[in-house]
């Protein structure tokens, strides 16, 4: 769910979450017995203070996102620190925009049984760890191109995209760190 405080994941929900308001979205998720997890909270900004109103309502934080560090290189590290300071469970996710990215980020859970309730309990008690590998930068560039085409972007936007795509290709070729 896209909200004014960022993206929010609703886990274990049975129905749609039809709102852009963070607080209403959390209420709907919790009303369905779900978990509200803040997704890639530092992808665009280092400002953790903006998230303070959200903390008491959250069930966890996505601390490994295979795409988040494209815009802010230490986004995942900042998310992990935030989760630790706020004492919130940690989650991992792919944020897949294409089939090749599925499974690049994930949450390993140590549950007593293979039931939704057992997994949910394990997640809330911190019996999980976020893991993954970084998505190729080219996939981020490609999804941005698709977004521009869908929204009827202006020609200058494509020039900016070309520079971003070149940067992404260079990262895929030369950057070795994860």
What feature does the model see in each segment?
Residues 29-37, 89:
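Short beta-strand/loop segments at the ligand-binding rim of alpha/beta enzyme cores
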Residues 2-16, 23, 27, 44-178:
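Charged catalytic cores and adjacent phosphate/nucleic-acid-binding surfaces used
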Residues 37-45:
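Aromatic-lined carbohydrate-recognition surfaces of secreted/lumenal glycan-active proteins
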């Amino acid at each position: 769910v896209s909200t004014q405080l960022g993206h929010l994941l609703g886990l274990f929900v049975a129905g749609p979450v039809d709102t852009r308001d963070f607080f209403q979205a959390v209420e709907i998720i919790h009303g369905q017995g779900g978990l509200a997890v803040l997704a890639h909270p530092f992808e665009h900004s280092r400002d953790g203070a903006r998230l303070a109103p959200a903390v008491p309502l959250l069930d966890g934080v996505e601390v490994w996102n295979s795409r988040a560090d494209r815009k802010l290189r230490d986004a995942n590290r900042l998310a992990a620190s935030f989760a630790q300071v706020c004492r919130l469970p940690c989650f991992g996710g792919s944020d897949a925009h294409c089939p090749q990215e599925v499974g690049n980020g994930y949450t390993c859970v140590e549950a007593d049984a293979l039931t939704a309730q057992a997994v949910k309990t394990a997640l809330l008690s911190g019996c999980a760890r976020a893991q993954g590998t970084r998505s190729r930068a080219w996939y981020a560039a490609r999804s941005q191109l698709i977004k521009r085409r869908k929204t009827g972007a202006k020609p200058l936007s494509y020039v900016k995209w070309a520079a971003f795509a070149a940067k992404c290709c260079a990262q895929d070729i030369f950057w070795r760190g994860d």
